[in-house]
C-alpha cells in the first residue's frame, strides 16, 4: 500500500491526525504532487478548517489545472459556505476537466436550485440519478426540482422511488403527500401525511397539511 492509500484509509477510519501526518510527509517528499494537496485539503475540511482546505485545493490546481477532484472539493466547501456562484463555477470546471460522477452532477444541480435556476438544475439532477439509481437523496432532490417546475406526475415517480430506497425519508413522504393533494387525491395525500407523523410526530408541515385536508372533506 502506498502512502496516499494509507492516508485515505486513515481518513476512512476517522484518524485525521494520522492522515494529516501521512499527507504532509508526501508533500515534503514530492511538493509537486497535486493529489497529496487534495487529500490534505479533504482532511482539513473534515475537521472544519475550510479556509485552509481551500488553499490546499488552490495549490493542487496551480500544480495541475486539470485536477478535476480539486475543483469538486473546493465546490463542496463554497456550497457549505452558501457561496453558490463560486460553487457553481467549481463544479462546472470539474465537469470540464472530466469529472462526470453522480456526485458532481448532483452538487451542480443542487447549487443551481439554490441560485433559483431550477430549469437549468433539472438535467444535472436527472443525470445524477441515472448514474446512481440507488441514491435516495438524489431522487428526492430531483423530485423536488420537478415539483417546483410543476411537473407533478414526474415528481411523484421520483418521490415514490426515494421512499422505496429509504423507507423513513419523511421529506419525500411529505412532498409526495403534497403532490397527491395537488392532483386532488386527498386520501392518498392523507395516507402520506399520516406516515410522516408516525415516523416524526413533531413534523409541523405534515400536521398542518393533514388538518387542512381533513377540514376540507
Regions from the language model: what does each represent?
Residues 5, 39, 73, 107, ...:
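Canonical tetratricopeptide repeat
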Residues 12-24, 47-59, 81-95, 114-127, ...:
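Structural signature of tandem alpha-helical TPR/SEL1-like repeats
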Residues 34-35, 68-69, 101-103, 136-137, ...:
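Helix-start (N-cap) detector for alpha-helical repeat units in TPR-like alpha-solenoids
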Residues 1-7, 185-217:
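Terminal, low-structured helical/coil segments at or just beyond the last alpha-helical repeat
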Amino acid at each position: 500500500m502506498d502512502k496516499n492509500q494509507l492516508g485515505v484509509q486513515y481518513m476512512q477510519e476517522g484518524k485525521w491526525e494520522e492522515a494529516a501526518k501521512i499527507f504532509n510527509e508526501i508533500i515534503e517528499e514530492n511538493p509537486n504532487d497535486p493529489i497529496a494537496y487534495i487529500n490534505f485539503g479533504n482532511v482539513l475540511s473534515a475537521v472544519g478548517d475550510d479556509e485552509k482546505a481551500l488553499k490546499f485545493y488552490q495549490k493542487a490546481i496551480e500544480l495541475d489545472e486539470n485536477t478535476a477532484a480539486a475543483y469538486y472539493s473546493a465546490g463542496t466547501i463554497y456550497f457549505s459556505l452558501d457561496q453558490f456562484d463560486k460553487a457553481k463555477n467549481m463544479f462546472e470546471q470539474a465537469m470540464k476537466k472530466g469529472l462526470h460522477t453522480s456526485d458532481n452532477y448532483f452538487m451542480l444541480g443542487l447549487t443551481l436550485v439554490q441560485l433559483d435556476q431550477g430549469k437549468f438544475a433539472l438535467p444535472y439532477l436527472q443525470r445524477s440519478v441515472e448514474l446512481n439509481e440507488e441514491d435516495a437523496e438524489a431522487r428526492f432532490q430531483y423530485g423536488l426540482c420537478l415539483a417546483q417546475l410543476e411537473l407533478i406526475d414526474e415528481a411523484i415517480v421520483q418521490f415514490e422511488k426515494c421512499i422505496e430506497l429509504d423507507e423513513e425519508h419523511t421529506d419525500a413522504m411529505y412532498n409526495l403527500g403534497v403532490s397527491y393533494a395537488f392532483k386532488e387525491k386527498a386520501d392518498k395525500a392523507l395516507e402520506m401525511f399520516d406516515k410522516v407523523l408516525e415516523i416524526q410526530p413533531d413534523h409541523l408541515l405534515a400536521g398542518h397539511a393533514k388538518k387542512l385536508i381533513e377540514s376540507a372533506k
